[in-house]
């Protein structure tokens, strides 16, 4: 009998184990579908700021690009959007009934809460910008890149949209004012605006059509402050009719420089002045403006360049500032008290896409990136643009690129200086191209090694182009290939010319194999590749 009972126990245990194996475990914070098929719908509270309607328009475009279906406002939307500083008592009570933690962020500027309540995704902003940021955060979480328009990043079509089942998060900015200074636009943004946006303005000025597109990007980046022509003219942004109005429609704050080392922010009727504590030296390294100011001020401003025009040398072509340097310097500035305003100078947002994204991510949440995690941040960013598999293969080439360009920016390869103001570059001794410090005789021929590294790098990014989807090849070229191939071509041009100048046997040059090998390095592939893309565009 005991033998039979033991057998029955074994059978019982066996079936229990089998049942546990077959039944899936309960989800712990898994994803749930918040939209499945048809049009995406959203509900808006009765009164909102204009910036929220601007964000809603972007959200509609995003959802249509994602799903292939229209997106529109509805009384029973899948997404509900609230703006606390304009909410009615009835709307506030409804949020309290849904257990939205209002007291934790209602008094924090630009903050928002996003969470799942029943069948709705609920977004609550403390003000208009906060609500706009929250709505566009849902776009990002659904698979839309910040660079959808500026970088031509086409979202991957999705049959359904998911969200974390336990999503319940508050986001509050680390830096109160997060801004862009658009400068030196005569080289890129100015001509582009004239050709494509049909803004016929004088050289270096940008109008409301350009700023409308820039402010859309800034909403996605969670920025809130704009300045223009910082080093050229105090009111260059306000000089153009319509700029102030479009800034107000996006709730953007206009910043102007003062001569006493402060920044004036025109947010309310009474301007706000903030002391500049740190500014970079033009090369990406932060310097304290005044030790006394740093000691006395607890909340100040930090200014940073991702493009630069002036002495000793410009860099207005490519953005090659190392991400690790941006991260380290801005964290230092924040820790030392420059935590109220961050302002970054660019001449074209598309050229500085990743570094600008990194800068604004840190301004929004200083904890999001550290010097030890910046590489993962870059890989994640690449994954959003081109997919995780491409990002995993692309991260090492980009690290190599930033290392090589960190040794010498492509704009600096002439080992010269920009001509002083008012001096014709043709007659400037400072502008003369000189031999570099790269040696062909020392350190195991570091000159050839530098060129070989660029050769290998160029080949790797060209091979990767084969796995890029056709609708992203243009974006891949602009964000990855062009900077790398152009930098490689510049290094080849300058360093091969240096090699040729050092050949002592000029008369026998064409019979000298040792001399011909470095001089005969072909840039045909690079040139043809760049020209082909130029023709296509």
Regions of interest found by a model, annotated:
Residues 234-254:
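Aromatic-lined substrate-binding rim segments of carbohydrate-active enzymes
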Residues 367-426:
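Charged, amphipathic alpha-helical linkers/stalks
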Residues 150-203, 210, 216-229, 298:
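An acidic-aromatic substrate-binding cleft motif
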Residues 299-319:
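Active-site clefts of carbohydrate-active enzymes
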Residues 12-21:
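Sec-dependent N-terminal signal peptides
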Residues 529-536:
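Single conserved hydrophobic/aromatic residue that forms the stacking wall/gate
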Residues 29-172:
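Contiguous, structured surface segment used for ligand recognition
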Residues 248, 260-297, 451, 455, ...:
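Gly/Pro-rich turn-and-neighbor structural signature
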